[in-house]
């Protein structure tokens, strides 16, 4: 089998008015060594918590979103000032002025994008004091204490369960998660079994449902937790569902065969929608409602035989006679369908 998830940038999702179920704040894979045991899990995913354990990492100034916002505004002001100075130096030659003005505007836009990356999603990169996990959380003004659920690979094997629990516990300890703020572990393979292709897709869907509902499902078969797992002070294995005021972020783990592991940090969609202005949010909601109505009609037309579910296109969205000029035109864009 297989599972499909539609991923796109936040700006594109807002512009198109598509439903946002969650934000992929971080993802990664890791292989730690050569292993002869097929089912033995590796520990390479520990690298997402790699940072110098100085005890002061959570207090770094750059982790403060207000500090980063101030630096971003300062950089944006510098870019705008540079663009104004360059425009003032343009000659009166209309041809040269037009081309130079286009370059200045394009370069200013590029610098603005770089500034957003530098002080936004990528501020923590190449900093040995900030781990990928901590940095990715801080992008959304969250900390390691805000991770409210962990979706385990959870194969219930003698090798996987203790190893996976210890790895998560070690990550949280290294990142100074507050003691007593335990993270519920969800091992949904007790219900779904172990699929092949869509395993992580099902787990991701479960995390998204937890983020949207605030309900952390229990592990129905967890009626006798192994004493060995008690050493993991940051992890708890609930046997019944927990209704919470809300879960801000969830951590999904996948431990594959041959020491291959993967990890994905998913943040609540409200963290994205919360940064929009009132006008932007209103426009997004309008587009979303329109898209939902169209999707509803399309689906029912499929069920009633009006048209097939997949309508395969047999011709390009441009005239065949102009294909060469289209390929060579960097400004060519298809008409918006939303």
Located regions from the model:
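Active-site-adjacent elements of ketosynthase-type condensing enzymes
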Residues: 28-48, 124-131, 155-170, 198-202, ...
């Amino acid at each position: 089998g297989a599972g499909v998830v539609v991923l796109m940038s936040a700006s594109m999702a807002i512009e198109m008015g598509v439903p946002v179920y969650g934000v992929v704040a971080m993802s990664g894979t890791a292989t730690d060594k050569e292993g002869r045991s097929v089912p033995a899990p590796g520990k390479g995913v520990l690298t997402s918590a790699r940072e110098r354990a100085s005890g002061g990492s959570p207090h770094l100034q750059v982790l403060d979103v207000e500090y980063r916002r101030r630096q971003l505004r300062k950089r944006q002001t510098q870019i705008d000032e540079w663009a104004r100075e360059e425009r003032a130096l343009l000659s009166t030659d209309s041809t040269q002025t037009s081309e130079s003005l286009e370059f200045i505007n394009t370069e200013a836009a590029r610098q603005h994008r770089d500034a957003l990356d530098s002080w936004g999603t990528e501020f923590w990169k190449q900093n040995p004091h900030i781990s990928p996990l901590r940095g990715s959380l801080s992008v959304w003004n969250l900390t390691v204490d805000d991770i409210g659920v962990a979706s385990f690979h959870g194969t219930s094997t003698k090798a996987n369960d203790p190893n996976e629990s210890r790895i998560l516990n070690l990550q949280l300890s290294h990142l100074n998660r507050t003691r007593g703020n335990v993270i519920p572990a969800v091992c949904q393979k007790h219900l779904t079994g172990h699929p092949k292709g869509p395993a992580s897709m099902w787990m991701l869907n479960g995390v998204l449902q937890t983020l949207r509902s605030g309900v952390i499902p229990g592990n129905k078969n967890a009626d006798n937790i192994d004493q060995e797992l008690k050493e993991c002070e940051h992890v708890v294995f609930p046997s019944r569902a927990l209704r919470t005021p809300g879960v801000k972020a969830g951590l999904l783990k996948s431990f594959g065969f041959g020491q291959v592991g993967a990890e994905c940090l998913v943040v609540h969609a409200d963290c994205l929608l919360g940064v929009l202005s009132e006008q932007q949010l209103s426009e997004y909601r309008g587009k979303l409602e329109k898209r939902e109505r169209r999707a509803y009609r399309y689906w029912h037309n499929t069920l009633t035989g009006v048209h097939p579910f997949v309508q395969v296109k047999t011709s390009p969205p441009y005239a065949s006679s102009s294909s060469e000029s289209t390929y060579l035109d960097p400004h060519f864009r298809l008409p918006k369908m939303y």
